[in-house]
């Protein structure tokens, strides 16, 4: 009678051990399958909250990086337009120097003026047509804010149409004594505008590096918290399988032993 009772007491313990092994096997199998140490809140309540926060920061940084890349592209387009205009103005300077040659006749000067007028028309076209996503970049003064994380970078666009007109560039008489002054003033103005866009792009590049570093660090931290240690998970899975097999064997032996006792008692 005492032996039967011991068997009855041991059987629940074996069942409990088997259940624990089953649960651990299920957990480790899920970790191996998903590659994640945390698959539900109950796995690590504190860890999952930290992981969620890191994921949010990574996603916010991704949005910021897209904004920064758009801003950088905008600055590059503007600088490309200014570079094209500057090349044309440099050609105007060369033509103006030629026009100062006292050996030229009127026909020569008219030919040079025609070349200058064509260059000026091209400059005005470039000023009006340089744009990004439908926004004109060179003929309207305004501030374009690029939001990235908690901060923002401002790109200032110039009104080159009026600024160059104020320099007398678009009414340029290539043979006049003050033509070079107008041209040199225009070149200085263009250099300032190009420098402003280059400065904004440098700021955006710095922000991009900062956001990228932050995202990498956050991703590594999240990985340490959430990712499964595959070697450890595989080892624990093997251990759980062995424990499960042992529990099943012990349960079978306990059931067989109980059956023998009951058979003896029934005689």
State what each model feature region is.
Residues 217:
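C-terminal catalytic core of tyrosine-transesterase DNA break-rejoin enzymes
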Residues 28-29:
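N-terminal signal-anchor/start-transfer transmembrane helix
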Residues 230-236:
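Surface-exposed loop/turn positions within long extracellular repeat scaffolds
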Residues 43:
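Short beta-strand/loop segment that forms part of the nucleotide-sugar
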Residues 1-23, 33, 37-40, 48-52, ...:
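Amphipathic alpha-helical coiled-coil/heptad-repeat segments
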């Amino acid at each position: 009678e005492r032996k039967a009772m011991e068997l009855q007491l041991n059987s629940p313990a074996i069942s409990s051990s088997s259940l624990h092994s089953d649960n651990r096997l299920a957990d480790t199998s899920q970790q191996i399958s998903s590659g994640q140490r945390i698959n539900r809140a109950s796995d690590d309540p504190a860890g999952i909250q930290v992981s969620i926060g890191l994921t949010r920061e990574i996603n916010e940084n991704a949005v910021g990086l897209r904004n920064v890349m758009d801003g950088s592209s905008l600055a590059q387009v503007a600088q490309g337009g200014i570079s094209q205009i500057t090349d044309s103005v440099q050609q105007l300077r060369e033509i103006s120097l030629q026009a100062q040659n006292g050996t030229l006749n009127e026909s020569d000067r008219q030919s040079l003026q025609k070349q200058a007028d064509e260059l000026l028309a091209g400059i005005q076209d470039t000023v009006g047509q340089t744009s990004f996503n439908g926004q004109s970049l060179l003929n309207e003064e305004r501030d374009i804010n690029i939001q990235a994380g908690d901060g923002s970078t401002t790109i200032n666009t110039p009104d080159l149409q009026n600024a160059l007109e104020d320099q007398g560039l678009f009414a340029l008489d290539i043979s006049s004594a003050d033509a070079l002054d107008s041209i040199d003033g225009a070149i200085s103005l263009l250099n300032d505008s190009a420098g402003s866009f280059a400065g904004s792009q440098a700021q955006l590049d710095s922000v991009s590096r900062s956001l990228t570093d932050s995202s990498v660090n956050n991703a590594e931290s999240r990985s340490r918290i959430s990712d499964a240690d595959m070697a450890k998970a595989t080892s624990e899975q093997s251990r759980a399988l062995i424990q499960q097999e042992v529990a099943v064997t012990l349960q079978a032996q306990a059931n067989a032993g109980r059956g023998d006792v009951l058979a003896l008692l029934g005689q």
